[in-house]
């Protein structure tokens, strides 16, 4: 009975540790900041990370996460360009197109309805 209890506690402990580990892995931590400019065509999106090390995390179209200095000129220019691009795309999807339909031309005939 003791062995079964110990085994159950070990399984619960492993499950808890693994679930905590998964959450930590999803968080991006910047250890260093890239100084070399990234071509804007390769950047898909970005997030701003506040904390011990401030950083802008660019996500490339291939899914790579690159940490950059938020005060660098090229970083600010990339953010501005991405914001304009996203705003333009958002406006494109939010607009509705109205297509005029043809209204039949009435004739001088009179229709009588009985009922």
From Swiss-Prot:
N-glycosylated and O-glycosylated. Transmembrane segments: none annotated. Its main location: secreted. SUPFAM superfamilies: Interleukin 8-like chemokines. Pfam families: IL8 (PF00048). Disulfide bonds join 30-67. It is found in: Secreted. The keyword Glycoprotein applies. Residues 1-19 form the signal peptide. GO terms for molecular function: CCR chemokine receptor binding; chemokine activity. The keyword Phosphoprotein does not apply. GO terms for cellular component: extracellular space. Chemoattractant for CD4-dendritic cells, but not for CD4+ dendritic cells, T-cells or B-cells. Belongs to the intercrine gamma family. This is Viral Lymphotactin. It comes from Rat cytomegalovirus (isolate England). The gene is vXCL1.
